[in-house]
Amino acid sequence: MRTAALLLPFALAASFTSAPLLAAPASPAHATAPQSQLRLQTFHPGPQAMFSVSSVLIEGRHDAILVDAQFGASDARRLVDLIRASGKQLTTIYISHGDPDYYFGLATLQDAFPKARIVATAQTVAHIQQTQAGKLAYWGPKMGSDAPKRLVMPQVLEGGALQLEGERLPLIGLDGPTPDRSVLWVPSLRAIVGGIPVVAGEHVWMADTQTPKSHADWLQTLQRLQALKPKVVVPGHYAPGAALDASALRFTADYIRAFDAEAAKAQDSAALVRAMRARYPTLAGVESLELSAKVAKGEMRWP
């Protein structure tokens, strides 16, 4: 396996965060290993965004792959600017999950890069097909001019990996208990990218996983990701300033266990929210916690 040291300089702009994760020369201990030619840039729309969803540009020498397309059209346009500034040819847009904050920006990306293929796993495509009309009806009026002018359906990705300039980038989790919750693995950078299983710096969205088995499966997925010993982890959702490393895996697993423990003791959602905020007083995304707590305590149905 190719290895590379990673440098993580973060540049905060007024409207978004672009975090280049640069592949540096291999350390002397691995001097004979081929050096990775890949480089990551992350895009985050900033704290003012409706959803803190990330996008990642995986760059080779000449070509690039984009992971996830943003939610609002204005953020997607800023993402277009980042891609163009890279000077690389965008060959592929990969959508890592079927919720609208991952793909509503596709029309903007497709207009800017019409030759790029747009793909997702069969599970993600099925999720989008089943939910896109309802999601647009709900979110469209709230988004106003930021709403997508059309919805773009990804093609089903054949096989379990992407390819970039001869390097295979496998999807991890397709053969696990929850194939709809996979992530992309960049072996030469030891980087986990995209998907919904991992969160950093904000309350974890628990409303979509409502059974003990779903939480056990989730923890199993996180354990599998930890076994990869990643150097970089770019979650599908993270708060600006969060560490993009393996600590996100530990945080997510600890949060799931804490939520389960507090939900079992709490009399109602308000008590559950208080308990989780006491455990995690600095996390962003309290609105997500409040809704998740209501679902967990049977006070509302979701979706």
Question: What kind of region is each of these model predictions?
Answer:
Residues 17-31:
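Signal peptide processing junction and immediate N-terminal pro/mature segment
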